[in-house]
Amino acid sequence: MFNRTTQLKSKHPCSVCTRRKVKCDRMIPCGNCRKRGQDSECMKSTKLITASSSKEYLPDLLLFWQNYEYWITNIGLYKTKQRDLTRTPANLDTDTEECMFWMNYLQKDQSFQLMNFAMENLGALYFGSIGDISELYLRVEQYWDRRADKNHSVDGKYWDALIWSVFTMCIYYMPVEKLAEIFSVYPLHEYLGSNKRLNWEDGMQLVMCQNFARCSLFQLKQCDFMAHPDIRLVQAYLILATTTFPYDEPLLANSLLTQCIHTFKNFHVDDFRPLLNDDPVESIAKVTLGRIFYRLCGCDYLQSGPRKPIALHTEVSSLLQHAAYLQDLPNVDVYREENSTEVLYWKIISLDRDLDQYLNKSSKPPLKTLDAIRRELDIFQYKVDSLEEDFRSNNSRFQKFIALFQISTVSWKLFKMYLIYYDTADSLLKVIHYSKVIISLIVNNFHAKSEFFNRHPMVMQTITRVVSFISFYQIFVESAAVKQLLVDLTELTANLPTIFGSKLDKLVYLTERLSKLKLLWDKVQLLDSGDSFYHPVFKILQNDIKIIELKNDEMFSLIKGLGSLVPLNKLRQESLLEEEDENNTEPSDFRTIVEEFQSEYNISDILS
């Protein structure tokens, strides 16, 4: 299943070559026997110079991890949701009634308290998406006037949807203690049909956040946004995307994002370069549109996958094609600050894109590409360290945290790739170092009473990548440093914000599953065929990818209408895997171990 990186050699010529009186290269199997198809006889007659070691199969395993990381920790956990065409159709009257409950639950004074929280703490998340943030208070006032007068228009509903997206963001990030000061939980008892007294720590904050997001989307539907497009659709979506909405509802989020891209291009606002003949209003508008564009590109990249074939971020070329090499030119200040934090965030994310493109590729990243990314990260680290930070302002501190966390994440991925593709001397030490940096950034937020910073979706995604890779690596390599790091990561995962909901539970399940694979690895002996290695753990990991790939193959659902023209196995994804298993030549006890583990720890349980 995994090949040797170096072919083994025997102490003496094989018996086949000795009998034939020909020169033997002493490889296992030797070249003569491979040509004559006598591999098995050759291998039986030889004695190995060295026993199997991790150095023989680890390079192949680490290359395999790239594919595993893409399909399991990225696509499977965050971007796959099974369509249920058998469920009861949506009842529009019920949807309206439920949304009206939550809209009536929010009172006027509470809405202004939410807006105050957004202004004082969450500016780094949405200021760039709004032209004039001071206008939001006026829009909230007008929202309540419209509700009192029952005077509605599409324009008003767009503002309502935008305002409710801000409310949703506030509910998501607000500390539970502050939420309890503003809202009473008792009106929700009857609505949710609960027999026990609820409090905000019982998952009620997540329920409230999800329903506030529904209210924002409900008002967008009332705008008939596909027939009457408006830039406020894009703004509302970008604000919702600062929560876990894109990962809770990946199919819906992808559809909305595609419509946002269409709307953005429909108004020809993707050309926001300043011109000499621009009047002051146009200049201000172009600045805002530029910020929206880069935020939209960031969302577009982070949601990219097999279920989202339409992309915007690909229209922006790699930073390495131009900016990375400007440092070799005279009179170029590579440390000059970007025009906005949105541009800074995008440039860092684009380096992440340059690395992650190799997750699902068989090609190897050139060493000069990795070195160029390393130089760029050093430049961005200097820029972020130089950012003015007002320690009294949560907006300023949150802005810097996001940038530092992004740089640390990309740095971790960079040295992981040095380890996988080039096994450089310091690569593992650097992976451990940046893992600790990421942990410290999160822990520092607890100490600084800024725990809500850790609710940013990027925190969950990064921890998923880090803890999964370290868990995987620890299966095959005994290292005290790696083992201790895994203990720290496991403890950190247990203390991540509960607002991450089911995704956090599924991450815990995935890490526990990898720890069970470690036990299986220690329990079952590795089979060595001379040129390949076999072990139930290898087979299980390979099957994991096949299962998630099949779950993302929509062809079976698109051909249902063809009836008897379609083979039955095409309508059952699982049968494709079963047919392949029937053709395997592994011993029966080997297959039994694999099947029992997959039955007890089904990888499909990480899916939504």
Curated annotation (Swiss-Prot):
Keywords in UniProt for this one?
Answer: Centromere, Chromosome, DNA-binding, Metal-binding, Nucleus, Phosphoprotein, Zinc
What domain of life does the native source organism fall in?
Eukaryota
Q: Name one GO cellular component term.
A: kinetochore
UniProt cross-references to SMART domains, sorted A to Z:
GAL4
The modified positions for Phosphoserine read S575
Subcellular localization: Nucleus; Chromosome, Centromere
Q: Which InterPro entries match?
A: Cep3_C, Sec_Metabolite_Reg, Zn2-C6_fun-type_DNA-bd_sf, Zn2Cys6_DnaBD
The record ties this protein, via CDD domains, to: Cep3_C, GAL4
- What GO terms in the biological process aspect are recorded for it? kinetochore assembly; mitotic spindle assembly checkpoint signaling; septin ring assembly
**What does the record give as the DNA-binding region?**
14-42
* PROSITE patterns (UniProt xref): ZN2_CY6_FUNGAL_1, ZN2_CY6_FUNGAL_2
Q: Name one GO molecular function term.
A: centromeric DNA binding
Further information in the entry reads: Present with 1900 molecules/cell in log phase SD medium.
Question: What does the record note on quaternary structure?
Answer: Component of the CBF3 copmplex, which is formed of CBF3A/CBF2, CBF3B/CEP3, CBF3C/CTF13 and CBF3D.
General function of this protein: Acts as a component of the centromere DNA-binding protein complex CBF3, which is essential for chromosome segregation and movement of centromeres along microtubules. CBF3 is required for the recruitment of other kinetochore complexes to CEN DNA. It plays a role in the attachment of chromosomes to the spindle and binds selectively to a highly conserved DNA sequence called CDEIII, found in centromers and in several promoters.
| PANTHER family the UniProt entry points to | CENTROMERE DNA-BINDING PROTEIN COMPLEX CBF3 SUBUNIT B, UNCHARACTERIZED TRANSCRIPTIONAL REGULATORY PROTEIN
What is the name listed in the Swiss-Prot or TrEMBL entry for this protein? Centromere DNA-binding protein complex CBF3 subunit B
Which species expresses this protein natively?
A: Saccharomyces cerevisiae (strain ATCC 204508 / S288c) (Baker's yeast)
Lineage, please? Eukaryota, Fungi, Dikarya, Ascomycota, Saccharomycotina
